[in-house]
Design a protein with these regions (language model features):
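Structural motif
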Residues: 107-115, 233-240
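N-terminal beta1-alpha1 ligand-phosphate binding loop
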Residues: 62-93
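A short beta-strand-loop structural module common to alpha/beta enzyme folds
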Residues: 96-108, 229
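Helix-loop-strand module that forms the ligand-binding subsite of alpha/beta enzymes
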Residues: 111-211
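Glycine-rich phosphate/pyrophosphate-binding loop and the adjoining helix
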Residues: 62, 81, 198-255
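Hydrophobic alpha-helical membrane-insertion segments
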Residues: 1-52
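Hydrophobic/aromatic beta-strand patches that form the interior of the parallel beta-sheet core
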Residues: 65-67, 100-102, 124, 180-182, ...
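Short helix-loop-beta junction
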Residues: 86-97, 215-221
Length: 255
């Protein structure tokens, strides 16, 4: 049980004093209480109580930052991403959550954007897949805002002079908060998930590993990704909206 105690100690900084732990619960679930931001989580651990992962449950209201990375460029007008951004705003507010937003292509004020990250419990990055990654405007936004947030969003890279090879990426100050990707791709889902296809069965999140890691560098953890596929050759906008609302309900739940 030594590993379980070590994991619990690691979790305590995120869960806070109100966390409740039950070892040996059915299915290997460690039941925990409310996080500091009001959200509820369960922790599932492995047989040896040495591995765990978070599963999103219902919550009180959550402060959610919505970032619209849609952009008109080439054959893309950006409308689908704007529509999904607006769908998220309406659906989350209807569920009782609080939202702030930035339409990246319309410009932004760096101190205000840093303040939004300090305010949020979760951030949703809405963006198309361009040449196997985010649009340059979204990456530029991340570069500028995260850099402007030095000392507020992250303290350092997590290492110390005593252990210069250990702890890289652990200096984030937004621990206990979360990030989610909402993506639009012309590629079918099978291009990501099917072995032998373009991405070799690696999955969507593997394609976005650097983007996830950039968010994790400031301390956030990953929520389930949402993706709309085949958006140019076989668009199903009404179904995308229905699916997205269901995804948001599953991830965040009503306040």
């Amino acid at each position: 049980m030594g590993a379980a105690r070590r994991n619990y100690a690691a979790l305590s900084g995120v869960l806070g004093r109100r966390a409740r732990l039950v070892i040996g619960a059915p299915g290997g679930v460690l039941r925990v209480g409310r996080l500091r931001n009001g959200s509820f989580f369960a922790v599932r651990i492995g047989r040896l109580f040495s591995e765990y992962r978070f599963e999103r449950l219902r919550s009180e209201h959550v402060n959610i930052l919505l970032l619209d990375g849609g952009k008109a460029f080439g054959h893309s007008a950006g409308r689908l991403n704007h529509t999904l951004h607006q769908t998220a705003r309406s659906a989350l507010q209807a569920q009782g959550h609080h939202t702030r937003e930035t339409v990246i292509d319309e410009g932004y004020d760096l101190p205000q954007e840093v303040d939004k990250f300090l305010w949020m419990d979760a951030v949703i990055w809405q963006m198309p897949g361009w040449w196997m990654g985010p649009p340059w405007t979204v990456k530029k936004y991340m570069d500028e805002v995260f850099t402007a947030g030095a000392g507020m969003l992250f303290a350092n890279d997590g290492r110390s002079s005593a252990s210069p090879t250990e702890g890289y990426g652990t200096g984030g100050l937004l621990t206990g908060r979360q990030h989610m990707l909402s993506l639009t791709w012309n590629a079918p889902l099978e291009a990501f998930t099917r072995a032998g296809d373009f991405f070799g069965g690696a999955g969507v999140d593997a394609v976005y590993l650097p983007f996830h890691k950039a968010n994790e560098f400031i301390g956030t953890s990953q929520l389930p990704t949402f993706i709309c596929n085949d958006v140019i050759k076989n668009p199903q906008v009404e179904q995308y909206i229905v699916n997205y609302i269901a995804h948001l309900e599953k991830v965040f739940g009503p306040a």
